[in-house]
């Protein structure tokens, strides 16, 4: 196979050159109206042959290859090649959504609209993937990065997003994966949090995304530019359900908004966004959770309340998640924020199951008042009933306490996790400390070493905190 630098895309390049030449020759007057660019309006790149296509690398018929895509002990390189016009479309769309690049400003009132997808070529290990759907991703982290003038933005990839336009890529996959997230390690100068936290959840036996380190290079018209160290994250609505549940046909929700707190009376369909079975207008499983959680038997007949709640919600999974999350700490999760989790109605059990998401803020005390205490003494009363009610129940609290001990003696054992930090520090340091200005959250290489030191200190402090709590 040729490397991506050796491969040619004559149609794309010739079209781009022709467009630039015409713009230079004819210019435009102040009276000209510039219409928003739309992908594919001016670039005719539909006539191509997918010469690198193989069943193993590109076909839907291949099983997801986790060993290839999510290898733990290496840093892999991935390249995006985007025409200058389409790159500008992405930037213009961001400006329309969030204001001028690098000019600061506050957070928008909502994140109702995702950034625009454009077709791009993806290169990995000398192989090309064709007309891959590519867009920026994220909410507050995306806006903050953009407003700070940093182009190290997170990306979402959908390998057959544009199959209707390009029939050659029908059901295109990346080693069995349709969708992937490439996260920018926002505000994480260690660049380890997303991966390590995700691994702790999975090593605890909870369903969750595989992760891996990648370096990203983007060529948007002037050659490859190093965008830095990223974390590749498996998508829940793609292969997590397919490979970690026996039946992946249930309802998957990604709650975001006031109702995601599960406070009584706050349910709205718009908050519980469906990521599967979207055409089925049925939220009865979510309503059953609200009803069971807030049933009057909670204060009059605790055993009956637990039985009803356990029938519709996997409390065992949630309590284990809660223990892991509270030990490792993450302020950007349920209990402080109304997002960053999925609910899956597992057909095998008939219960809604909690799945964690988004761990770049984990493994630290955190912002906005910090993470929750192990005994939830700082939990806002009445605002987070799933934690408040379960922790107040002696049976559920005993399970939570048992899970705390398992986490701190297992996946988050101080010696184990510090050895992990040391191994990953050696692995990614050359790539992290060579990030370039405008594409990094580091102010200098010393920031990386300091961040690793803080992670090690945090691990020791959490062990002491759990020991004190359990005593």
Task: Give residue spans per PLM region.
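Middle-to-C-terminal accessory/interaction subdomains
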Residues: 56-58, 67-69, 73-77, 86-90, ...
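Conserved oxyanion/phosphate-binding beta-strand-loop segments in alpha/beta enzyme cores
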Residues: 118-186
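Bacterial Sec-dependent N-terminal signal peptides
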Residues: 23-61
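Bacterial N-terminal signal peptides
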Residues: 14-24
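Hydrophobic alpha-helical membrane-insertion signals
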Residues: 52-140
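Short, solvent-exposed loop/turn elements at domain surfaces
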Residues: 86-93, 130-132, 141-144, 165-168, ...
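Internal "kinase-insert"/substrate-recognition segments embedded within catalytic cores
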Residues: 152-165, 173-185, 191, 204-209, ...
């Amino acid at each position: 196979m040729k490397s991506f630098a050796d491969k040619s895309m004559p149609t794309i390049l010739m079209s781009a050159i022709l467009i630039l030449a015409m713009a230079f020759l004819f210019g435009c007057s102040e009276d000209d109206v510039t219409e928003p660019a739309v992908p594919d309006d001016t670039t005719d790149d539909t006539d191509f042959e997918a010469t690198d296509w193989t069943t193993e690398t590109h076909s839907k018929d291949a099983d997801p290859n986790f060993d290839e895509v999510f290898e733990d002990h290496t840093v892999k390189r991935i390249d995006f090649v985007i025409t200058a016009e389409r790159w500008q479309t992405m930037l213009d769309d961001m400006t329309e959504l969030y204001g001028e690049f690098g000019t600061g400003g506050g957070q928008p009132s909502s994140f109702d609209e995702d950034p625009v997808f454009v077709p791009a070529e993806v290169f990995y290990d000398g192989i090309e993937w064709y007309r891959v759907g590519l867009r920026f991703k994220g909410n507050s982290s995306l806006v903050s990065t953009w407003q700070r003038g940093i182009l190290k933005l997170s990306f979402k990839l959908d390998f057959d997003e544009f199959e209707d336009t390009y029939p050659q890529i029908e059901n295109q996959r990346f080693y069995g994966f349709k969708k992937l997230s490439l996260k920018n390690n926002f505000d994480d100068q260690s660049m380890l949090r997303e991966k390590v936290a995700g691994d702790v959840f999975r090593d605890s036996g909870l369903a969750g995304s595989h992760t891996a380190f990648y370096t990203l290079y983007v060529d948007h018209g002037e050659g490859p530019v190093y965008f830095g160290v990223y974390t590749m994250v498996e998508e829940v609505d793609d292969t997590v359900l397919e490979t970690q549940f026996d039946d992946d046909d249930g309802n998957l929700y990604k709650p975001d908004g006031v109702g995601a707190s599960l406070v009584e009376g706050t349910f709205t369909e718009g908050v519980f966004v469906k990521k599967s079975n979207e055409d089925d207008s049925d939220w009865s499983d979510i309503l059953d959770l609200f009803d069971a959680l807030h049933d009057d038997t909670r204060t009059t007949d605790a055993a009956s309340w637990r039985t009803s709640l356990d029938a519709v919600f996997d409390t065992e999974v949630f309590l284990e998640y809660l223990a892991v999350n509270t030990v490792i700490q993450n302020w950007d999760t349920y209990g402080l924020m109304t997002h960053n989790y999925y609910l899956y109605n597992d057909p095998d059990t008939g219960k809604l199951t909690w799945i964690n998401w988004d761990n770049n803020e984990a493994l630290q005390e955190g912002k906005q008042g910090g993470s929750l205490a192990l005994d939830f003494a700082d939990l806002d009363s009445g605002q987070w009933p799933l934690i408040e009610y379960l922790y107040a129940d002696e049976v559920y609290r005993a399970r939570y306490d048992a899970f705390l001990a398992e986490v701190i003696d297992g996946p988050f054992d101080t010696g184990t996790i510090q050895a992990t930090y040391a191994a990953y520090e050696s692995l990614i340091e050359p790539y992290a400390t060579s990030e370039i200005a405008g594409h990094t959250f580091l102010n200098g290489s010393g920031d990386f070493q300091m961040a690793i030191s803080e992670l090690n200190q945090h691990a020791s402090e959490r062990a002491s905190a759990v020991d004190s709590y359990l005593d």
